[in-house]
Protein backbone atom coordinates (compact mmCIF):
# COMPACT_ATOMS: atom_id res chain seq x y z
CA UNK A 1 0.00 0.00 0.00
CA UNK A 2 2.55 2.56 -1.12
CA UNK A 3 1.91 5.16 -3.80
CA UNK A 4 4.87 7.23 -4.93
CA UNK A 5 3.64 10.68 -6.07
CA UNK A 6 6.65 10.95 -8.41
CA UNK A 7 5.38 8.09 -10.60
CA UNK A 8 3.34 10.40 -12.88
CA UNK A 9 6.54 12.36 -13.57
CA UNK A 10 8.10 9.20 -15.04
CA UNK A 11 4.99 8.74 -17.19
CA UNK A 12 5.41 12.32 -18.44
CA UNK A 13 9.04 11.68 -19.34
CA UNK A 14 7.89 8.76 -21.49
CA UNK A 15 5.59 11.11 -23.40
CA UNK A 16 2.32 9.65 -22.07
CA UNK A 17 0.93 12.98 -20.89
CA UNK A 18 -2.72 11.93 -20.74
CA UNK A 19 -1.89 8.93 -18.57
CA UNK A 20 0.27 11.08 -16.29
CA UNK A 21 -2.58 13.58 -15.90
CA UNK A 22 -5.01 10.75 -15.10
CA UNK A 23 -2.71 9.45 -12.37
CA UNK A 24 -2.47 12.91 -10.82
CA UNK A 25 -6.18 13.70 -11.11
CA UNK A 26 -8.33 10.66 -11.95
CA UNK A 27 -11.48 12.81 -12.15
CA UNK A 28 -10.08 14.46 -15.29
CA UNK A 29 -8.92 11.20 -16.92
CA UNK A 30 -9.31 11.05 -20.69
CA UNK A 31 -7.66 7.63 -21.08
CA UNK A 32 -8.13 4.29 -19.27
CA UNK A 33 -5.92 4.02 -16.22
CA UNK A 34 -4.86 0.97 -14.21
CA UNK A 35 -2.16 0.02 -11.75
CA UNK A 36 -1.28 -2.89 -9.50
CA UNK A 37 -0.29 -2.48 -5.85
CA UNK A 38 1.01 -5.22 -3.51
CA UNK A 39 -1.83 -4.75 -1.01
CA UNK A 40 -4.75 -3.42 -3.05
CA UNK A 41 -4.11 -5.55 -6.12
CA UNK A 42 -5.36 -4.28 -9.45
CA UNK A 43 -6.89 -0.82 -9.40
CA UNK A 44 -8.71 0.38 -12.50
CA UNK A 45 -11.24 3.07 -13.25
CA UNK A 46 -11.11 6.74 -12.33
CA UNK A 47 -13.41 6.51 -9.32
CA UNK A 48 -11.63 3.57 -7.72
CA UNK A 49 -8.23 5.15 -8.34
CA UNK A 50 -9.32 8.50 -6.88
CA UNK A 51 -10.56 6.82 -3.70
CA UNK A 52 -7.36 4.81 -3.35
CA UNK A 53 -5.14 7.87 -3.86
CA UNK A 54 -7.09 9.71 -1.15
CA UNK A 55 -6.42 6.84 1.25
CA UNK A 56 -2.76 6.99 0.26
CA UNK A 57 -2.56 10.70 1.07
CA UNK A 58 -3.89 10.00 4.57
CA UNK A 59 -1.59 7.01 5.05
CA UNK A 60 1.52 8.99 4.08
CA UNK A 61 0.59 11.75 6.54
CA UNK A 62 -0.08 9.30 9.37
CA UNK A 63 3.17 7.43 8.79
CA UNK A 64 5.19 10.68 8.38
CA UNK A 65 6.48 9.45 5.04
CA UNK A 66 9.61 10.82 3.42
CA UNK A 67 10.57 9.53 -0.03
CA UNK A 68 14.20 9.09 -1.07
CA UNK A 69 14.93 8.65 -4.77
CA UNK A 70 17.37 5.86 -5.61
CA UNK A 71 17.54 5.56 -9.42
CA UNK A 72 15.52 5.63 -12.63
CA UNK A 73 16.08 3.37 -15.64
CA UNK A 74 14.63 4.17 -19.08
CA UNK A 75 14.58 1.79 -22.02
CA UNK A 76 12.33 0.12 -24.59
CA UNK A 77 9.49 2.57 -23.95
CA UNK A 78 9.43 1.81 -20.22
CA UNK A 79 10.78 3.38 -17.05
CA UNK A 80 11.64 1.73 -13.76
CA UNK A 81 11.81 4.02 -10.75
CA UNK A 82 13.32 3.09 -7.40
CA UNK A 83 12.81 4.75 -4.05
CA UNK A 84 13.18 4.16 -0.33
CA UNK A 85 10.07 5.15 1.60
CA UNK A 86 11.06 6.22 5.11
CA UNK A 87 8.08 5.89 7.42
CA UNK A 88 6.95 5.42 10.98
CA UNK A 89 6.10 1.83 11.84
CA UNK A 90 3.34 0.62 14.18
CA UNK A 91 5.84 0.71 17.07
CA UNK A 92 6.80 4.30 16.31
CA UNK A 93 10.24 3.36 14.98
CA UNK A 94 11.36 4.71 11.61
CA UNK A 95 12.00 2.15 8.88
CA UNK A 96 12.97 2.25 5.22
CA UNK A 97 10.85 0.37 2.68
CA UNK A 98 12.39 -0.17 -0.77
CA UNK A 99 9.80 0.42 -3.51
CA UNK A 100 10.08 0.11 -7.29
CA UNK A 101 7.60 0.85 -10.03
CA UNK A 102 7.63 -0.29 -13.63
CA UNK A 103 5.94 2.33 -15.82
CA UNK A 104 4.87 0.87 -19.15
CA UNK A 105 2.37 3.11 -21.01
CA UNK A 106 1.90 0.61 -23.86
CA UNK A 107 0.74 -2.12 -21.45
CA UNK A 108 -2.87 -2.71 -20.35
CA UNK A 109 -1.38 -2.47 -16.84
CA UNK A 110 0.84 0.60 -17.22
CA UNK A 111 1.95 0.99 -13.58
CA UNK A 112 3.23 -2.02 -11.64
CA UNK A 113 4.39 -1.38 -8.08
CA UNK A 114 6.83 -3.79 -6.43
CA UNK A 115 7.76 -4.03 -2.77
CA UNK A 116 7.81 -6.48 0.10
CA UNK A 117 5.16 -6.21 2.79
CA UNK A 118 7.39 -7.78 5.39
CA UNK A 119 8.75 -4.43 6.69
CA UNK A 120 5.13 -3.29 7.19
CA UNK A 121 3.54 -6.49 8.51
CA UNK A 122 6.43 -8.56 9.83
CA UNK A 123 5.68 -11.34 7.33
CA UNK A 124 5.67 -12.12 3.63
CA UNK A 125 2.44 -12.08 1.62
CA UNK A 126 1.96 -14.12 -1.56
CA UNK A 127 1.01 -11.94 -4.52
CA UNK A 128 -0.35 -13.09 -7.85
CA UNK A 129 1.67 -12.39 -11.02
CA UNK A 130 0.97 -9.21 -12.97
CA UNK A 131 2.52 -10.29 -16.28
CA UNK A 132 3.12 -13.44 -18.28
CA UNK A 133 6.67 -14.67 -18.85
CA UNK A 134 8.14 -13.51 -22.16
CA UNK A 135 10.55 -16.05 -23.69
CA UNK A 136 12.09 -13.23 -25.75
CA UNK A 137 13.16 -11.25 -22.66
CA UNK A 138 16.92 -11.35 -22.14
CA UNK A 139 19.24 -9.37 -19.87
CA UNK A 140 22.51 -8.46 -21.58
CA UNK A 141 26.20 -9.11 -20.80
CA UNK A 142 27.13 -9.45 -17.12
CA UNK A 143 23.54 -9.11 -15.91
CA UNK A 144 22.49 -11.95 -18.19
CA UNK A 145 25.38 -14.02 -16.80
CA UNK A 146 24.27 -13.20 -13.25
CA UNK A 147 20.68 -14.20 -13.96
CA UNK A 148 21.81 -17.48 -15.57
CA UNK A 149 23.99 -18.24 -12.54
CA UNK A 150 21.09 -17.58 -10.16
CA UNK A 151 18.92 -19.92 -12.24
CA UNK A 152 21.59 -22.62 -12.06
CA UNK A 153 22.44 -22.18 -8.39
CA UNK A 154 26.11 -21.51 -9.22
CA UNK A 155 27.47 -19.45 -6.33
CA UNK A 156 30.91 -18.93 -7.85
CA UNK A 157 29.46 -17.63 -11.12
CA UNK A 158 27.03 -15.33 -9.28
CA UNK A 159 29.80 -13.80 -7.20
CA UNK A 160 32.08 -13.50 -10.25
CA UNK A 161 29.47 -11.24 -11.86
CA UNK A 162 29.87 -8.72 -9.02
CA UNK A 163 32.67 -6.24 -8.52
CA UNK A 164 34.88 -7.10 -5.51
CA UNK A 165 33.05 -4.46 -3.46
CA UNK A 166 29.67 -5.15 -5.07
CA UNK A 167 26.51 -4.95 -2.99
CA UNK A 168 23.23 -6.83 -2.76
CA UNK A 169 20.16 -5.37 -1.06
CA UNK A 170 17.18 -7.57 -0.36
CA UNK A 171 13.51 -6.55 -0.51
CA UNK A 172 13.35 -5.71 3.21
CA UNK A 173 15.99 -2.98 3.01
CA UNK A 174 19.43 -2.24 4.41
CA UNK A 175 19.15 -4.84 7.17
CA UNK A 176 19.51 -7.36 4.34
CA UNK A 177 22.42 -5.63 2.59
CA UNK A 178 25.54 -7.65 1.78
CA UNK A 179 28.85 -6.16 0.60
CA UNK A 180 31.91 -7.76 -0.96
CA UNK A 181 32.95 -11.20 -2.13
CA UNK A 182 32.85 -12.92 1.27
CA UNK A 183 29.38 -11.73 2.27
CA UNK A 184 27.95 -12.35 -1.21
CA UNK A 185 29.37 -15.88 -1.23
CA UNK A 186 27.79 -16.63 2.14
CA UNK A 187 24.48 -15.16 1.01
CA UNK A 188 24.19 -17.16 -2.20
CA UNK A 189 25.46 -20.37 -0.63
CA UNK A 190 22.58 -20.00 1.81
CA UNK A 191 20.11 -19.22 -0.97
CA UNK A 192 21.15 -22.27 -2.98
CA UNK A 193 21.12 -24.63 0.01
CA UNK A 194 17.46 -25.45 -0.66
CA UNK A 195 18.34 -27.84 -3.46
CA UNK A 196 19.65 -25.65 -6.25
CA UNK A 197 19.05 -22.40 -8.08
CA UNK A 198 16.19 -19.94 -8.36
CA UNK A 199 14.92 -20.10 -11.97
CA UNK A 200 13.31 -16.72 -12.53
CA UNK A 201 10.96 -16.41 -15.51
CA UNK A 202 11.57 -13.04 -17.16
CA UNK A 203 8.64 -10.85 -18.17
CA UNK A 204 10.30 -7.54 -19.10
CA UNK A 205 13.85 -6.20 -19.30
CA UNK A 206 14.52 -2.45 -19.20
CA UNK A 207 18.13 -1.41 -19.85
CA UNK A 208 19.95 1.90 -20.28
CA UNK A 209 23.55 0.70 -20.59
CA UNK A 210 24.31 1.23 -16.91
CA UNK A 211 21.34 -0.43 -15.24
CA UNK A 212 19.27 -3.47 -16.14
CA UNK A 213 15.85 -3.82 -14.50
CA UNK A 214 14.01 -7.07 -15.00
CA UNK A 215 10.52 -8.09 -13.92
CA UNK A 216 10.05 -11.78 -13.33
CA UNK A 217 7.92 -14.54 -11.91
CA UNK A 218 9.35 -16.84 -9.24
CA UNK A 219 7.62 -20.20 -8.86
CA UNK A 220 10.50 -22.40 -7.70
CA UNK A 221 13.35 -22.07 -5.23
CA UNK A 222 15.75 -24.98 -5.37
CA UNK A 223 13.65 -28.11 -5.14
CA UNK A 224 10.71 -26.26 -3.55
CA UNK A 225 7.73 -25.30 -5.70
CA UNK A 226 6.23 -21.92 -4.80
CA UNK A 227 3.00 -20.14 -5.74
CA UNK A 228 3.88 -18.02 -8.80
CA UNK A 229 4.84 -14.55 -7.56
CA UNK A 230 6.08 -11.37 -9.26
CA UNK A 231 9.25 -9.45 -8.55
CA UNK A 232 11.72 -6.96 -9.96
CA UNK A 233 15.50 -6.74 -9.71
CA UNK A 234 17.72 -3.83 -10.73
CA UNK A 235 21.43 -4.39 -11.38
CA UNK A 236 23.83 -1.46 -11.79
CA UNK A 237 27.09 -1.94 -13.68
CA UNK A 238 30.28 -0.30 -12.44
CA UNK A 239 33.09 1.17 -14.49
CA UNK A 240 34.74 -2.25 -14.72
CA UNK A 241 31.64 -3.72 -16.37
CA UNK A 242 30.80 -5.88 -13.36
CA UNK A 243 27.73 -5.52 -11.16
CA UNK A 244 28.25 -2.78 -8.58
CA UNK A 245 24.85 -3.27 -6.94
CA UNK A 246 21.79 -5.49 -7.16
CA UNK A 247 18.50 -4.46 -5.56
CA UNK A 248 15.56 -6.84 -5.28
CA UNK A 249 11.87 -5.98 -4.93
CA UNK A 250 9.59 -8.95 -4.24
CA UNK A 251 7.80 -10.71 -1.39
CA UNK A 252 9.01 -14.25 -1.98
CA UNK A 253 9.63 -16.22 1.21
CA UNK A 254 12.81 -18.25 0.86
CA UNK A 255 12.64 -21.92 1.94
CA UNK A 256 15.95 -21.43 3.78
CA UNK A 257 16.93 -19.96 7.14
Regions found by a protein language model. Give the residues of each.
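A solvent-exposed, acidic/Ser-Thr-rich amphipathic alpha-helical stretch
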Residues: 21-77, 155-209
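Short, low-complexity N-terminal intrinsically disordered segments enriched in polar/charged residues
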Residues: 1-21, 119-160, 164, 255-257
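Structured N-terminal alpha/beta-domain signature
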Residues: 10-37, 99-106, 111-115
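A beta-strand edge to alpha-helix "cap/lid" segment located at domain peripheries
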Residues: 54-138, 185-257
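A structural signal for well-ordered alpha-helical scaffolds and beta->alpha junctions
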Residues: 4-7, 46-49, 96, 143, ...
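A general structural-boundary detector
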Residues: 35-39, 90, 133, 145, ...
Amino acid sequence: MVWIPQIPDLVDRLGATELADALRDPASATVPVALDDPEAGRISGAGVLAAWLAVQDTWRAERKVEIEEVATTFGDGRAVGEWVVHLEGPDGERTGLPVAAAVDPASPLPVRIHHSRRPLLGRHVVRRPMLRPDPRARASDVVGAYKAAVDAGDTAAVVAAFAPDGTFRGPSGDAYRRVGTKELTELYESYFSAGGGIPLKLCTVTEDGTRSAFEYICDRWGDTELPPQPGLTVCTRGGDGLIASARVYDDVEAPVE
